[in-house]
Regions:
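Short Pro-Cys-Gly-centered "Cys-loop" motif that presents a nucleophilic cysteine in a tight turn
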Residues: 1-59, 67-355, 364-369
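Charged, glycine-enriched surface loops/patches
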Residues: 360
Length: 369
């Protein structure tokens, strides 16, 4: 099962897939298990026709970025080839022998052979089947090796369709590749062996192909980007995303401390960053009081709504990159109410967001409400 929307059934779409081990148990602690899972992800991708763009296998969950292309005609020869990648040469030989025997039985047998081929075709070009193959295989292998019984995976996997634009896709891949850094599992961007970025730096063809897809834009002289240029661009992206994450983490610590909760510094933050976040929170709260007083002077509901929209734009101008939760603090409106105002302003072209869940900026078009 998946909690993805119906959009995940559309073709020519990019998907961010995540799945967690049940109860956050570290079943992927052993290096061999992570290696085997990556190998099955590769094999399942070949069989289903899904294109791997990136991956990261952590000790209790995994991330995959994949492209689902439009289906192509798959004849018997191609089915057997893909089945061989998935099940091995012996598995493909067994299927081929089964088909041959059925065809010796006449018309009825030929129809049954075609039915079996159609069963395999229907498993292709499907994100759901791709994930099912990966998770089912890993469960069976893990249980067999470790005499384990019971649930291994934490319910449904999560499948988010990523907007088909360069900025959103590269940022999603960057988020995936930052997982080991945020978890203190490595100190460098390419230092985690079970990340596709590490594989890319080591010359892995699948990882290189995925990165080329993500960084598919041309240079000014219309040539394809060299691998070192892709690496430079990606590491610059990772550095920027990591800095934003550090600042967000410092703000979380500052908020907890302001609420009287214990919040120790972690490896990626400093007391100086937390102090800066505390100053920012104080400024935001002061601005909130001022805006609240301005709103109370407004008359009708329509006038108050216009005032709130203007406050949102003013706050975004004052704090470029401000996030939705910070706007809630400033404006003192409900989460659902804020989202309605943000949706209206974004639709009008007055504001824009840095990808899904990112900070807000005034639109380059500068449209006013």
């Amino acid at each position: 099962m998946s909690n993805s929307s119906n959009r995940s059934k559309e073709y020519d779409t990019v998907h961010h897939i995540t799945s967690r081990i049940a109860h956050k148990v570290r079943f992927l602690q052993e290096e061999a298990e992570r290696n085997d899972l990556i190998e099955m992800i590769r094999r399942a991708a070949v069989f289903t026709g899904v294109k791997l763009l990136g991956w990261c296998i952590m000790i209790n969950h995994f991330h995959i970025l994949a492209f689902l292309p439009a289906p192509i005609e798959v004849d018997e020869k191609e089915i057997l080839r893909r089945y061989g990648v998935l099940k091995g040469a012996k598995g493909a030989a067994t299927l081929e022998e089964q088909l041959s025997k059925l065809r010796l039985e006449g018309e009825t047998g030929c129809k049954e052979a075609e039915r079996l081929l159609d069963v395999q075709r229907k498993r292709m070009y499907s994100i759901g089947e791709f994930v099912k193959i990966v998770k089912q295989w890993f469960s069976e292998e893990y249980n067999r090796r470790n005499s384990h019984t019971g649930t291994l995976w934490e319910g449904a996997y999560h499948d988010r369709v990523v907007a088909y634009c360069h900025k959103d896709i590269v940022e999603c891949l960057g988020y995936i590749h930052l997982n080991p850094i945020r978890a203190a599992a490595c100190a460098t961007f390419d230092g985690y062996a079970w990340s596709s970025y590490s594989a890319f730096k080591k010359g892995d063809e699948v990882a290189i192909d995925g990165m080329r897809f993500v960084y598919s834009q041309k240079t000014e002289d219309e040539r394809e980007l060299a691998l070192y240029e892709i690496a430079e661009m990606h590491e610059e992206l990772l550095a920027n995303l990591l800095e934003k994450w550090k600042l967000r983490r410092a703000e979380e610590i500052a908020r907890k401390r302001a609420a009287g909760q214990a919040a120790p510094i972690d490896p990626l933050t400093t007391e100086a960053m937390v102090a800066q976040a505390e100053e920012h929170i104080a400024e935001v709260r002061a601005a909130s009081m001022e805006l609240h007083e301005r709103r109370t002077r407004a008359g009708s509901v329509k006038e108050r709504h216009v005032a709130i929209e203007q406050e949102i734009i003013s706050s975004i101008e004052l704090y470029p990159g401000i996030r939705s939760e910070q706007l809630i603090d400033i404006l003192g409106v409900s989460k659902s109410g804020l989202y309605r105002f943000l949706a209206k302003l974004r639709k009008s072209g007055a504001i824009e967001q840095e990808g899904k869940g990112g900070g807000w900026h005034k639109s380059i078009l500068g449209k006013q409400v």
